[in-house]
Amino acid sequence: MLKKGPAVIGATCLTSALLLSGCGLFQSDKAAEEIDPPQDVTFVNDEAGANSNTTAAKKTESEKSDTAKADQASSTVMRELYLIDKNGYVVAQTLPLPKSESTAKQALEYLVQGGPVSEILPNGFRAVLPADTTVNVDIKKDGTAIADFSNEFKNYKKEDEQKIVQSVTWTLTQFSSIDKVKLRINGHELKEMPVGGTPISDDLSRKDGINLETAGVNDLTATHPLTVYYLAENEDSEYYVPVTKRIDNSEKDDITAAINELAKGPSKVSGLLTDFSEDVKLVSKPKIKDGRVTLDFNQSIFGSADEKTKMISSEVLNSIVLTLTEQPDVKSVSVKVNGKSELVNEKGEKLTEPVSRPSQVNTGSF
């Protein structure tokens, strides 16, 4: 298991804004909601400008600059794009896209190599779909999105086949109106991918998993998928990577299973990191009520060797919340240690309220 070292802590650009009590972790705005459109701005034509003094001129330039910045902010909206990182993982990056009425179609267009994403592509990431691919998206009332691609869609490398399916599925299902996805090429529904022949289920969804880890699994039918979140890093930041593992069907408590997988950590060859101690354990069965799960840990959950501090690291809490809220019945997470709610975050703030899942993750600047 790879532990997160001090270099990663210094490089973090995400966690300073995290762990607000009762708040989301990265981006609190819902993906399906748009920011307010820009208001009409009236400009006054100053015919006497030549007589204005220098101070007034500077003030006018400053006002214009502020207006331009406001217009730029109000003309974009943050979207999750599932891109491929340097380790080959499919990972969400939340990036500013121009406002569009065709939001789902636009999101897929930003997955195309050499397309508009090139101007905002984060360091260490690459686009997923082959260059020059075009797409239309038809969203049905039952929550199915039909993504119909052009012939260029076939021009991908075989090793990217599953990554493409996962990227398209997870990018589209960020929208509240989309639960499942079907793929087409020029109107013809795909039952398998065109290059490597990977079978495609009738309705692709997040239940199919992402960044599948099947090493050591002899019988897939005797297991079920469970997605957990580990850490990865690039030159200037760290980010969260979803990994779908296979859990034995004899395990009926997926919440406990998820915590055990987080404590176990990623495989040594994965290139992923963790801030979890291997000694972290739940001291009682998780309790779920009204979408809130309450977890009671042993003291190994603390990120400080000083027991008086009772601090949980932001990376640990974020991984827990992202992991558990992938499960449909969980909306927020409360954490206790040996039955007591005395934890604080890295800012020293008490975690008195449950922490909810963000609508968007990995919102670090590009």
From Swiss-Prot:
Ranges annotated as biased composition (Basic and acidic residues): 58-69
S-S bonds: none
Domain of life: Bacteria
Compositionally skewed regions (Polar residues) per UniProt: 357-366
SMART domains the record matches: Germane (SM00909)
Keywords of the record: Germination, Sporulation
Keyword Metal-binding included in the entry's annotation: no
Chain intervals for the UniProt region annotation (Disordered): 42-72, 346-366
Entries under Pfam families matching the protein: Germane
GO biological process: sporulation resulting in formation of a cellular spore
Record has Ligase as a keyword: no
Cited InterPro entries: GerMN
Cited function: Unknown. Affects both sporulation and germination.
Protein name as it appears in the record: Spore germination protein GerM
Species: Bacillus subtilis (strain 168)
